[in-house]
């Protein structure tokens, strides 16, 4: 394995042997989901008691229109919860998802968290665990990957964020409606990760464990190259209740329910 490839992947968190991290993603928090918000708060409170770090792998919010929307009813309670946990000594890190990729420095300062590159590493002793939101591995969805490249471009983001907040909300609503329509018509297989892309990441980054969200297909998958852990999405307001994540500590990776 080339050391150059390994050096290019940043380390998000280095845990000591006695430390523990809580990893969650895809909560899609919003003002019309009070029960899910309550479960999130309970999870953060548990992390303060039992963990040293909270790692959020994207899609914490249903969507993000810009850091000038921090006082919105859907966002302010979440920021307040994170800030209180950080003030209590919890290290909080956040990786962008496909819903909240516009969250920026002002959000990070308000919530007292650190923004992460995607992908990056969590290390604990000999353990090297790659963490990612997961959408970059869904390479069979060519249209989505094209869209992802466009909206992650700094120039596109600058132009979008220069528009009035109300207009941004309207544009996002339209994009979400189109996305839901496309997902309803597209083959379900392309919404999942591509096995060859996963194997390529195992090989090029020198890891044997990957943790990601995005697909809403929780589980543990073994391949000859390593183990892939898929985090659950969260839903406690409508439909079947679900939610949780994984703990990372000296004993390895353990899933938990919210």
Regions found by a protein language model. Give the residues of each.
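Core catalytic region of metal-dependent phosphoesterases/phosphodiesterases
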Residues: 2, 6-20, 29-124
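Short, basic/glycine-rich phosphate-binding loops at helix/coil junctions
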Residues: 19, 23-26, 59-61, 168-181
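Residue-level marker for buried hydrophobic side chains located in beta-strands
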Residues: 21-23, 54-56, 130, 211
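Active-site metal-binding loops of divalent metal-dependent hydrolases
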Residues: 25-28, 59-60, 98-99, 134-136, ...
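Conserved beta-sheet core of the metallophosphoesterase superfamily
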Residues: 110-117, 128-130, 135, 141-147, ...
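Active-site-proximal loop/helix segment associated with metal-binding centers of metalloenzymes
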Residues: 132-194
């Amino acid at each position: 394995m080339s050391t150059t490839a390994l050096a290019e992947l940043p380390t998000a968190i280095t845990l000591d042997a006695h430390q523990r991290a809580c990893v969650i993603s895809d909560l899609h928090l919003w003002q019309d989901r009070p029960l899910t918000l309550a479960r999130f708060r309970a999870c953060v409170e548990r992390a303060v008691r039992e963990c040293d770090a909270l790692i959020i792998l994207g899609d914490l919010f249903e969507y993000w229109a810009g850091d000038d929307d921090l006082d919105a009813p859907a966002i302010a309670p979440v920021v307040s919860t994170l800030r209180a946990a950080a003030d209590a000594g919890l290290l909080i890190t956040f990786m962008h998802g496909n819903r909240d990729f516009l969250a920026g420095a002002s959000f990070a300062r308000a919530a007292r968290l650190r923004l992460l590159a995607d992908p990056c590493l969590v290390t604990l002793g000999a353990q090297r665990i790659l963490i990612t939101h997961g959408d970059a591995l869904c390479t069979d969805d060519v249209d989505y990957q094209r869209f992802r490249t466009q909206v992650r471009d700094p120039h596109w983001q600058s132009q979008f964020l220069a528009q009035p907040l109300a207009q941004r909300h309207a544009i996002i609503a339209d994009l979400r409606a189109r996305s839901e329509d496309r997902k309803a018509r597209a083959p379900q297989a392309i919404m999942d990760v591509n096995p060859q892309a996963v194997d390529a990441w195992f090989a090029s980054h020198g890891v044997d464990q990957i943790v990601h969200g995005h697909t809403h297909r929780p589980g543990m998958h073994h391949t000859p190259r390593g183990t892939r852990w898929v985090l659950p999405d969260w839903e406690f307001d409508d439909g079947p209740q679900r939610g949780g994540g994984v703990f990372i500590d000296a004993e390895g990776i353990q899933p938990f329910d919210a």
